[in-house]
Amino acid sequence: MLNALYPLLRPALFSMDAEDAHHFTLNNLMRAKRMGLAGCIGNSIADDPRTVMGVRFPNPVGLAAGLDKDGAYIDGLAAFGFGFIEVGTVTPRAQPGNPRPRMFRLPQADALINRMGFNNGGVDAFIRNVQASRWKAEGGVLGLNIGKNADTPIERAADDYLYCLERVYPHASYVTVNISSPNTKNLRQLQGASELDSLLSTLKAAQQRLADQHKRYVPVALKIAPDLDDDQVRNIGDALVRHKIDGVIATNTTISRDAVKGLPHAEEAGGLSGRPVFEASTRVVRALREVIGDALPIIGVGGIFSGADARAKIDAGAQLVQVYSGLIYRGPTLVRECASALRR
């Protein structure tokens, strides 16, 4: 039902502040779920399983991190038919993020700009929400995305990632290490060669220790930016292979404004997502695949607004895809459309 209604609902949602609309929609999704109206919300899960990173994904279309930062809406979002859901980014301690307003629509470009700043309730509250959801207990694939607190010096970033990794590990299907948000000061420095080498070495050792402790291996993926030149992509790819990281998510939002110059809100600080990031993110997927070969899988994300867009990510070298901004603009029908386009 929501597939048909969303085009009618969208003007009302888009008349609201973007962040207010976000929370309004998610709260009502959960309300519908609790009332037993899940069948009216969206789609059944398309059965098109893929095994990636050693995990069986019911289908290759997932939700990107950022929509549900605290893991509070997992069961409502599950009704959209995703093959996997990624929640977060979560940090060790609760933090408010950046001052509002901090999310802006650019409807002329099917785009969003956000400078949320990892607003979240902290990893302990995050885990309680994850444990309360039925999605994982019922076999759903759940990615948990971790970051660092804004007031943690970049030199101590590894401490925050380790803290979060140790706490989310028992509850995750996979863990994503987010070093590519443009909204936490200096975070993208961790994509530099020496910084990345040190971080990945530390995290890989912790992953192996946690696997022994919990008698279960949970894969770790790295989320990278689209604003990378060929040398940077090569350095990152080499580091991923060298440290035997399980996967890579390409990409996060862009700081470029080339595709939206002159549009209202185009000069707002933050990360740009939506259609304008599609080409840049797909270029990184393709370049990364050339560097890493078949050593590890890529999850392609950035500007997917159609089944053809999802197929283009796969053709560029991704094994799975994720959506976010396209879901805001197109509604849950996008999930079914992408799953159909990728069906084998």
Curated annotation (Swiss-Prot):
Which Gene Ontology MF annotations are present?
dihydroorotate dehydrogenase (quinone) activity
Active site positions, chain numbering: S181 (nucleophile)
Cofactor(s) demanded = FMN
Which sites bind substrate? K69, N114, R115, M116, G117, F118, N178, N183, N252, T253
- Reported EC number(s) for this entry are 1.3.5.2
Q: Which GO terms describe its biological process?
A: 'de novo' pyrimidine nucleobase biosynthetic process; 'de novo' UMP biosynthetic process
Q: Does the keyword Membrane apply?
A: yes
| The protein's annotated pathway | Pyrimidine metabolism; UMP biosynthesis via de novo pathway; orotate from (S)-dihydroorotate (quinone route): step 1/1
Q: Which PANTHER family match?
A: DIHYDROOROTATE DEHYDROGENASE (QUINONE), MITOCHONDRIAL, DIHYDROOROTATE DEHYDROGENASE (QUINONE), MITOCHONDRIAL-RELATED
Spell out the protein name for this chain: Dihydroorotate dehydrogenase (quinone)
The gene name on file is: pyrD
